[in-house]
Amino acid sequence: MLKTTLLFFVTALCEIIGCFLPWLWIKRGASVWWLLPAVASLALFVWLLTLHPAASGRVYAAYGGVYVCTALLWLRVVDGVRLTVYDWCGALIALCGMLIIVVGWGRT
């Protein structure tokens, strides 16, 4: 379970970085060269999703819970925005959904 969650976390970071770098280029006028590591990060994201031993749809559904929490962590650390009680509640609900799916995929 911990290995799966850690893999989901690293996968989410790759996806977020792969989307954040083009955002910097478009919104903040960063160098177009930031698109190269963005592409590499998104390619790594896709590859990491293939490392899970469950059906792809189930992996994507479970991954979503960790993605939500990782995005909120990004919001706090990178964007400097304080999380609200709604953010925390949403993260808890998303993680509960992920947990139910991951525990269940070992039993089917």
From Swiss-Prot:
Membrane topology value: Multi-pass membrane protein
Positions in the Cytoplasmic compartment: 27-30, 82-84
InterPro entries xrefs: UPF0060
Cellular component annotations (GO), alphabetically ordered: plasma membrane
Key words of the record: Cell inner membrane, Cell membrane, Membrane, Transmembrane, Transmembrane helix
Residue ranges annotated as Periplasmic topological domain: 1-5, 52-60, 106-108
A Pfam family the protein falls into: UPF0060
Cellular compartments annotated: Cell inner membrane
Residue ranges crossing the lipid bilayer per the database entry: 6-26, 31-51, 61-81, 85-105
Family (UniProt): Belongs to the UPF0060 family.
Family annotation (PANTHER family): UPF0060 MEMBRANE PROTEIN YNFA
Official protein name in the record: UPF0060 membrane protein YnfA
